C-alpha cells in the first residue's frame, strides 16, 4: 500500500477529534491547526514525525500557510475559516483544499448559499435580502411580501440558532429586539416555515462528483440546539428517499469532495424545503459511527483522499444520538450522564475532552442502537431522563411511554387490521401472543370496501412507519389481506374469519388464491394465534431474541403434549376423557 497523503485539519474541536479515529485505523497522517496544545482533536492522535500539531488560530494566514506547507490536503471541521487564504494556497500549488474554497465561501454566507441553490431548482423557503443598515420601513415592507411571522437570519457566522431571530410583528419594539439580538451583521429574511419535522441528511461526495447519501434522520432541537437525532426518518411513504434525493441534488451542485450535512424542513403537506448545508461532518451524522457501515468521518477522509467511498447503509434497524450538554461550569452532570449511559444496552459514550464545561456547551454525545423503534424508545427514555434538564412532557413527545393495556404502541413492529369490529373477537388472540413475546403492535379497523383510501394509505405507509409485518383479518369476500399485500412490500398474513354462512371457507379461498406476484400468507380459519406466531417468526429472522423465544415456545408446547401423554398412559383413557368433560 502506498503511503497515505498527509491531511491538515483547520479546527481542533470534537469533529476533528472524531476524524482522528478512522484516520488512525486507515494510517492517515493528520496535522491539526488550532489554538492550544491539548484541544479535543489533538488529544487523540499524534502528529506524523517530525511534525507537531501547529498551535494557532485556524483563521490566521500565517498559520494556514505553515500548515499547508506540511500537508498534501487541507480540510475543515468548521466552515468559519479564511476562504480567501485557502483559495490562494491552492492556486499557488502549496496544497490541495477539500471541499473547494469556493464552496466553503459560498456556504459561509447563508444568503448566497440559499440564492445559489434556489437558482438551481432546489426547493427552499421564500427569502429576501435586507439592505445594509435596514430601517423599520424596510422590515415592514419585507414583512408585507413574506408575511408574518418571518425569520430574520444573519448571513454569516451563524450556527446553533445564534444567527436567527423570529419577527412576530412589524412593531418597532419587535424589530429593535431582533436587531439587538442579531447585532451589526448583514441580514436576510425568510418566510416562516411551519414544519412538522426538522430533517437532516449526510451526503458524501468524491472528487469525481459521485454522491452517496445516508438515511435521513429526524433532528429534534430545544432552545435552538440539537438535542436528539432519530434514525432512520419515519413518516409517510417515501419521505426518507425524497429527503435523500433533495440532499444529493443540492450537494451535486457544489464543488469539491467531503461530507456535507444538509438540513431541511418537512412541511405539513409533505413537501421538503432545504434549510442550509454544512461543508463538513455534522452533529446530525454522529450516529453513523455505531449505526452505519461507514461513519461520516471515515467517508469524509475517503472522499478527500480519493479512496473508495464506503457504504452508507445502516447496520441496525433503529438508532439515536443524544447530545451531552454542559449544565454548569462543573463536570458533575457530564460524568453522571456518561455513567448512566454505560448501564443502557446498545449505548456508546463519546466525550469530547473539553477542559471546561458551561451551560449548553456540547461536551459529548451518546449513540444508542436497537433492533426496533420500540426497543430504541425504551433505551432513549433511560438516557433522556438522566439529563439534568429532563422534562417528562418533552421526553414523552420524543420517546412515548409504553401504552396502556389494550392500546396501540407508538412504535409498533406488527400491524393488526380487520375489516369490521365484528372481527375483533377472532383477532384478539393475536394480541395476546404478541404481548407474550413482547412484540409492540398496533390494532385498528380498515375496510377494503368501505374505507379503501384508508386501507391504501395504511398499506403504503406501513414500512416507512417501522412496521415489519401486517396481520389482516377478513370474512366473506375477504379482500382486505390481498389488497393490503398488493400495496406494501411487507409480509402480510391473512386470517380467514368465519362469517354467518359457508363457515369461513369462502374467506379462506379468497385469501389463499392471490394471483402470482402478490404473496399473502394464510392461516387457518379464525386462527389469529398462528398469524401472530408467524409474525413473530418473521421478526425472529432479524431479531435473535425473538428467534430464541419461538424455540422456547415450541419446546413448551412439546413438553405440554408429553405431559398429557404421560397422564393418559398412566391413568387410562376412560378416566382421562372424564377429566376432559369437566
UniProtKB/Swiss-Prot annotation:
It catalyses: 5-amino-1-(5-phospho-D-ribosyl)imidazole-4-carboxylate + H(+) = 5-amino-1-(5-phospho-beta-D-ribosyl)imidazole + CO2. GO terms for biological process: 'de novo' IMP biosynthetic process. Residues 114-305 form the ATP-grasp domain. ATP binds at residues 143-200. GO terms for molecular function: ATP binding; metal ion binding; phosphoribosylaminoimidazole carboxylase activity. Pathway: Purine metabolism; IMP biosynthesis via de novo pathway; 5-amino-1-(5-phospho-D-ribosyl)imidazole-4-carboxylate from 5-amino-1-(5-phospho-D-ribosyl)imidazole (carboxylase route): step 1/1. InterPro entries: Ade2_fungi/plant, ATP-grasp, ATP-grasp_carboxylate-amine, ATP_grasp_subdomain_1, PreATP-grasp_dom_sf, PurE_ClassI, PurE_dom, PurK. Signal peptide: none annotated. It comes from the Eukaryota. Keywords: ATP-binding, Decarboxylase, Lyase, Nucleotide-binding, Purine biosynthesis. In the C-terminal section; belongs to the AIR carboxylase family. Class I subfamily. This is Phosphoribosylaminoimidazole carboxylase. The lineage of its organism: Eukaryota, Fungi, Dikarya, Basidiomycota, Agaricomycotina.
Amino acid at each position: 500500500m502506498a503511503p497515505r497523503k498527509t491531511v491538515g485539519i483547520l479546527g481542533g474541536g470534537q469533529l476533528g477529534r472524531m476524524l482522528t479515529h478512522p484516520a488512525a485505523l486507515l494510517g492517515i497522517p493528520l496535522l491539526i491547526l488550532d489554538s492550544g496544545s491539548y484541544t479535543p482533536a489533538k488529544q487523540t492522535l499524534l502528529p506524523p514525525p517530525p511534525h507537531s500539531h501547529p498551535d494557532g488560530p485556524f483563521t490566521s494566514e500565517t498559520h494556514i500557510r505553515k500548515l499547508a506547507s506540511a500537508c498534501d490536503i487541507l480540510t475543515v471541521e468548521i466552515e468559519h475559516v479564511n476562504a480567501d487564504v485557502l483559495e490562494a494556497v491552492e492556486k499557488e500549488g502549496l496544497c490541495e483544499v477539500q471541499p473547494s474554497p469556493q464552496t466553503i465561501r459560498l456556504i459561509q454566507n447563508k444568503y448566497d448559499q440559499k440564492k445559489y441553490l434556489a437558482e438551481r431548482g432546489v426547493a427552499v423557503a421564500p427569502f429576501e435580502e435586507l439592505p445594509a443598515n435596514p430601517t423599520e420601513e424596510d422590515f415592514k415592507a419585507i414583512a408585507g411580501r413574506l408575511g408574518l411571522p418571518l425569520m430574520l437570519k444573519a448571513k454569516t457566522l451563524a450556527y446553533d440558532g445564534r444567527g436567527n431571530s423570529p419577527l412576530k410583528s412589524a412593531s418597532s419594539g419587535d424589530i429593535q429586539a431582533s436587531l439587538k439580538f442579531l447585532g451589526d451583521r448583514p441580514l436576510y429574511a425568510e418566510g416562516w416555515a411551519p414544519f412538522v419535522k426538522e430533517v437532516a441528511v449526510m451526503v458524501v461526495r468524491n472528487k469525481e462528483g459521485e454522491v452517496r447519501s445516508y438515511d435521513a434522520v429526524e433532528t429534534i432541537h430545544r432552545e435552538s440546539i440539537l438535542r436528539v437525532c432519530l434514525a432512520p426518518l419515519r413518516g409517510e411513504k417515501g419521505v426518507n428517499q425524497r429527503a435523500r434525493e433533495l440532499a444529493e441534488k443540492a450537494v451535486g451542485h457544489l464543488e469539491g469532495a467531503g461530507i456535507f450535512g444538509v438540513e431541511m424542513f418537512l412541511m405539513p403537506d409533505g413537501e421538503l424545503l432545504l434549510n442550509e448545508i454544512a461543508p463538513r461532518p455534522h452533529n446530525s451524522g454522529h450516529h453513523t459511527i455505531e449505526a452505519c457501515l461507514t461513519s461520516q468521518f471515515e467517508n469524509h477522509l475517503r472522499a478527500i483522499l480519493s479512496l473508495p467511498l464506503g457504504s452508507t447503509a445502516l447496520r441496525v434497524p433503529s438508532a439515536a444520538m443524544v447530545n451531552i450538554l454542559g449544565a454548569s461550569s462543573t463536570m458533575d452532570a457530564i460524568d453522571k450522564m456518561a455513567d448512566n449511559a454505560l448501564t443502557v444496552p446498545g449505548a456508546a459514550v463519546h466525550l469530547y475532552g473539553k477542559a471546561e464545561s458551561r451551560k449548553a456547551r456540547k461536551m459529548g454525545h451518546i449513540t444508542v442502537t436497537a433492533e426496533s423503534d420500540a426497543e430504541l424508545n425504551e433505551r432513549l427514555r433511560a438516557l433522556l431522563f438522566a439529563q439534568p434538564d429532563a422534562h417528562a412532557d418533552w421526553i414523552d413527545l420524543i420517546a412515548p411511554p409504553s401504552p396502556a393495556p389494550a392500546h396501540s404502541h407508538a412504535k409498533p413492529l406488527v400491524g393488526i387490521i380487520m375489516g369490521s369490529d365484528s372481527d375483533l373477537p377472532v383477532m384478539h388472540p393475536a394480541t395476546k401472543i404478541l404481548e407474550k413475546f413482547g412484540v409492540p403492535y398496533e390494532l385498528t379497523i380498515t375496510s377494503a370496501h368501505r374505507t379503501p383510501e384508508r386501507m391504501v394509505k395504511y398499506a403504503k405507509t406501513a414500512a416507512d412507519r417501522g412496521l415489519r409485518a401486517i396481520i389482516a383479518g377478513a370474512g366473506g369476500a375477504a379482500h382486505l389481506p390481498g389488497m393490503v399485500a398488493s400495496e406494501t412490500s411487507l409480509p402480510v398474513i391473512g386470517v380467514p374469519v368465519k362469517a354467518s354462512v359457508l363457515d369461513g371457507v369462502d374467506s379462506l379461498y379468497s385469501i389463499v388464491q392471490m394471483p402470482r406476484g402478490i404473496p399473502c400468507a394464510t392461516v387457518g380459519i379464525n386462527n389469529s394465534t398462528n398469524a401472530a406466531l408467524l409474525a413473530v417468526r418473521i421478526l425472529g429472522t432479524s431479531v435473535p431474541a425473538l428467534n430464541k423465544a419461538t424455540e422456547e415456545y415450541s419446546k413448551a408446547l412439546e413438553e405440554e403434549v408429553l405431559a398429557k401423554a404421560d397422564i393418559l398412559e398412566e391413568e387410562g383413557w376412560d378416566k382421562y376423557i372424564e377429566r376432559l368433560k369437566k
